[in-house]
């Protein structure tokens, strides 16, 4: 009789937090049939590469055709309430007040001393609703602390376990989505979706699986992220793979993603920044609009000083021969 044994790591998001065990994402039912090489990504098992392809082939497919990557370990927080915009404008370096509903912005998140401890994307879901997508669960607790200090009227909810997401990246990604995505007249179609915008849509028809698709990514290629409920994840994976079978689509893991994001100059916590450097030193000074954001935000005073006296500089090296 065949027996199956699972493997988990116990970890804490903070020193005083309860331990949590590594979990599977909604896409595991499909990805586990294609690879046994999984890595622990902040509490979730995600593929490092796939048996039939390997890191180099997956990297090449993203640059030339298309890949799909499970990124469900990203933390998602819903920020709701009359003071939601005030909170996010105060806690992020970006000017959140410039966002319109349906827009996405990449931002740094800093301590009072100007050091950057997380980054992510902020989606404006409604007039009083935002979704913060980032790398670390601590960001949610930190947002709650800041809201309490300022007496903001907001609800902050961790929605990570209710929202899974895959990243569809590569030159053929738009063509793949257009084959099976239905968008209502009130939402932008896939062909109309602009960079750093999102659309609310469904699979194939009005009664199909509900999705959100954002034109975002972590590879430097044309790309999108597909957001769904974990219970719908296997069917969504099937639809993506079926639509991409004639477009050179293959699954890719974290190994290829690391190569892609380094080439694109995209930073990762624990590598290019670590809670000690500021956004200017980490190469994302564009996320700190000191001249145009007149409102106060956490770290502003020290970021003004640190911009004038950087201690480090992140640079990219292009290798022209072996």
Question: Language-model features: where?
Answer:
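Acidic active-site catalytic centers that drive phospho-/nucleotidyl reactions
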Residues: 70, 119, 225
């Amino acid at each position: 009789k065949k027996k199956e044994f699972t493997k988990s790591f116990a970890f804490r998001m903070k020193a005083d937090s309860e331990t949590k065990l590594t979990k599977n994402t909604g896409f595991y039912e499909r990805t586990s049939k294609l690879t046994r090489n999984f890595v622990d990504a902040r509490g979730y098992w995600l593929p490092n590469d796939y048996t039939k392809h390997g890191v180099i082939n997956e990297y090449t497919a993203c640059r030339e055709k298309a890949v799909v990557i499970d990124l469900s370990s990203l933390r998602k927080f819903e920020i709701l309430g009359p003071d939601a915009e005030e909170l996010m404008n105060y806690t992020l370096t970006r000017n959140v007040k410039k966002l319109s509903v349906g827009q996405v912005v990449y931002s740094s998140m800093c301590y009072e001393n100007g050091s950057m401890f997380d980054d992510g994307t902020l989606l404006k879901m409604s007039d009083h609703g935002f979704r913060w997508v980032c790398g670390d669960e601590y960001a949610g607790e930190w947002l709650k602390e800041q809201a309490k200090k300022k007496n903001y009227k907001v609800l902050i909810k961790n929605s990570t376990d209710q929202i899974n997401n895959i990243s569809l990246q590569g030159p053929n990604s738009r063509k793949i989505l257009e084959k099976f995505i239905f968008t209502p007249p009130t939402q932008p179609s896939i062909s109309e979706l602009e960079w750093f915008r999102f659309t609310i849509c469904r699979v194939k028809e009005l009664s199909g699986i509900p999705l959100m698709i954002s034109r975002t990514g972590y590879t430097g290629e044309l790309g999108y992220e597909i957001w769904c409920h974990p219970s719908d994840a296997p069917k969504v994976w099937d639809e993506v793979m079926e639509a991409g079978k004639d477009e050179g689509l293959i699954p890719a893991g974290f190994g290829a993603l690391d190569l892609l994001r380094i080439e694109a100059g995209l930073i990762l916590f624990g590598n290019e920044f670590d809670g000690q450097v500021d956004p200017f030193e980490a190469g994302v000074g564009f996320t700190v609009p000191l001249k145009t954001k007149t409102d106060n935000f956490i770290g502003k005073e020290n970021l003004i000083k640190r911009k004038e006296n950087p201690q480090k500089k992140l640079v990219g090296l292009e290798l022209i021969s072996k």
